[in-house]
Amino acid sequence: MADPSAKQTGQKSVKIAAGAVVCVESDIRGDVTIGARTVVHPKARIIAEAGPIVIGEGNLIEEQALIINSFPENLLPNTDDVEPKPMIIGVNNVFEVGCVCQALKIGDNNVIESKADVGRSVMLTSGCIVGSCCQIHTCEVIPENTVIYGSECLRRVQTERPQPQTLQLDFLMKILPNYHHLKKTVKSSGTPARS
């Protein structure tokens, strides 16, 4: 079993805004800021290795989702001249079960579906959907309202953004505290700004 004191030291810089629901069973490491009305399920992992992670308001991070700000494959973490790059996540995004997200910039109203994998060099704008099991590791900016789908990661543009998961967030904020212990909110000087 892991050393409990090691887990506490890794979570010193975790800031959770009032109104966020973050389950104790989630794994949050490094300098992470979580905005109000964001729900983090048990077994979700948010790991800030190469720089801070700032998560905006109203995001839904489901079980076994991995949001990680890691070093690029060609850099070692002990290199002194590496500047930490923040990962900024906007508002009303959904990270579904088992997805992996390394993108340093994510706009608003995006959905990363189950088992999808978004690489570090990708920049998601707003209103995008990355379909189940789709992998994007190209160095590009995904245009607004793009849907990536299918085994060949085909693309199309939808006319409207995905609807925010307001009702689901309200339901989870009411139900999760009944069945899971929550991490304490930390009052900070300010909540994450809208991007």
UniProtKB/Swiss-Prot annotation:
The gene is dctn6. One of its GO terms (cellular component) is kinetochore. It is found in: Cytoplasm, Cytoskeleton; Chromosome, Centromere, Kinetochore. PANTHER family: DYNACTIN 6 (PTHR13072), DYNACTIN SUBUNIT 6 (PTHR13072:SF0). Coiled coil: none annotated. One of its GO terms (biological process) is mitotic spindle organization. Its main location: cytoplasm. The keyword Cytoplasm applies. Keywords: Centromere, Chromosome, Cytoplasm, Cytoskeleton, Kinetochore. Belongs to the dynactin subunits 5/6 family. Dynactin subunit 6 subfamily. GO terms for molecular function: dynein complex binding. This is Dynactin subunit 6. Part of the dynactin complex that activates the molecular motor dynein for ultra-processive transport along microtubules. Member of the pointed-end complex of the dynactin shoulder complex which contains dctn4, dctn5 and dctn6 subunits and Actr10. Within the complex dctn6 forms a heterodimer with dctn5. Interacts with plk1. The keyword Cytoplasm applies. It comes from the Eukaryota.
